[in-house]
């Protein structure tokens, strides 16, 4: 993983604690329980292979047109979001949004929310992504995450059918 990975995981936690000792113990527990699985290949639930597969299945099933469009322009969806998943969005989303997502990980005691969040972000950017003709354009569309509200995107992605049914 290296120093970059440690820093990526530790930085959001630094906003929560003034005392280094508290920070260390919380970070250690977070890493031991969740983050280490993002760098492990195993048969355990929540390892990086399972999360990658989960992303591909969820995204392909919910947005097949976008999924195949991205493949056609040499921008495989998993390749686009892999670092988001590996670092649980640290370094991509704003710190407050990372903390909101990590709160869901802790609440559900599961990393499965991470690939769903990745699919939700691609789905949210669907219109602009479908206009892209090459991988470089896709990267430009996804580069700015400053306005993303991850909890709202998750809710919209997971409950869109129910929301639409309530409107009818």
Model-derived segments and spans:
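Helix-rich, well-folded core regions that mediate interactions or catalysis
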Residues: 1-168
